């Protein structure tokens, strides 16, 4: 006990050491960029002594920020990864007692450690609001573009813990949803996997899945939270593979709220709320599938760009376009198929090329966005796909392990004996509970 107290005191003294630190970092020349970074200092109660900016000498699109601050070691450790998520840190000049010794973690890409950290990456969309490609069905429709901008602003203003804004959908949007809902429901009994068919009626009962009603994301999120611990977070558009998979690690599904253009209800060049609600949500309500999705997300945290791309491709050919075997027949569990009438028919037509799911092969397959896939991968079951992905995840090169804590909705970085011992103690308790339960069942089999 004395030794523990001594160690705690040393750790406390160590973390409370303060000093004057100079940081230089570069930012993209965009609206609000500096405000986001300064907010990091404010929220971590760091006193800024001096700040100035200058045009970057390396890139015209960037400018450099010089910050002089009074900060503790603990604060420096807290804000450094947050700064790296918004800016490129060029220089840190600090007293020796505040400079953390270099280790392999310095080379690891920033990743969220707790669910609220998703606020730092959920708005890094690749396309924003009314910015539509020229071949988009709504490109020339100014009313539709304004509507898309409205949905984008709602998502960009969302923060973890906020209720998802309720939407009053237009008659045109409801009609578009209704067409998709009606046509897909004709195919589901003969094409969708049994887990999907089991959960869809529950969504009709508790979340208002009907032909004449577009479900509210807040209602859907609350339903999923009770079923599998997943929650919904509104997003303005496409996220990078790294940012999207990061959400899955915390059982957060980034979900669009906008509806595709009404000129072609059966086609969309991008994920819309019809795709999310009809394709993804019913299976996110399935515990085994939810676990599978989260494990792909966890494998992506801190991984290299090459590895993240491989994981994203495996996600694409399972969660988006995966097939499985049930009762001797092929069935669909991929959301991209379950929300596309024509490709759903094609995938089970007997003319599509199918292969057994193998992550090492699937990760090299080209993902097609505007046409049917060249090949579809078949899993024996969700458990089979999960086991194969677990083996694949073991090949991810990271100088640490990760353990998700569902109570705090955070990830524990396992990189030393202390953190690993702590994780083992938690596991030992869980095993004791199961062991005790087995003993009781054996003792009183009729209970």
Swiss-Prot record:
Residues 22-97 form the ACT domain. GO terms for biological process: aromatic amino acid metabolic process; bone remodeling; mammary gland alveolus development; platelet degranulation; positive regulation of fat cell differentiation; regulation of hemostasis; serotonin biosynthetic process. L-tryptophan binds at residues 238, 260, 268, 339, 369. The keyword Protein biosynthesis does not apply. Its EC number is 1.14.16.4. The modification Phosphoserine is found at residue 61. Keywords: Iron, Metal-binding, Monooxygenase, Oxidoreductase, Phosphoprotein, Serotonin biosynthesis, Ubl conjugation. Pathway: Aromatic compound metabolism; serotonin biosynthesis; serotonin from L-tryptophan: step 1/2. The keyword Phosphoprotein applies. GO terms for molecular function: iron ion binding; tryptophan 5-monooxygenase activity. Disruption phenotype: Mice display impaired hemostasis, resulting in a reduced risk of thrombosis and thromboembolism, although the ultrastructure of the platelets is not affected. Blood platelet counts are normal. Defects are caused by inability to inability to mediate protein serotonylation of small GTPases during activation and aggregation of platelets. Its cofactor is Fe(2+). It catalyses: (6R)-L-erythro-5,6,7,8-tetrahydrobiopterin + L-tryptophan + O2 = 5-hydroxy-L-tryptophan + (4aS,6R)-4a-hydroxy-L-erythro-5,6,7,8-tetrahydrobiopterin. Ubiquitinated, leading to its degradation by the proteasome. Ubiquitinated is triggered by phosphorylation. One of its GO terms (cellular component) is cytoplasm. Fe cation binds at residues 275, 280, 320. Belongs to the biopterin-dependent aromatic amino acid hydroxylase family. Homotetramer. Interacts with DNAJC12. Oxidizes L-tryptophan to 5-hydroxy-l-tryptophan in the rate-determining step of serotonin biosynthesis. NCBIfam families: Trp_5_monoox (TIGR01270). This is Tryptophan 5-hydroxylase 1. It comes from Mus musculus.
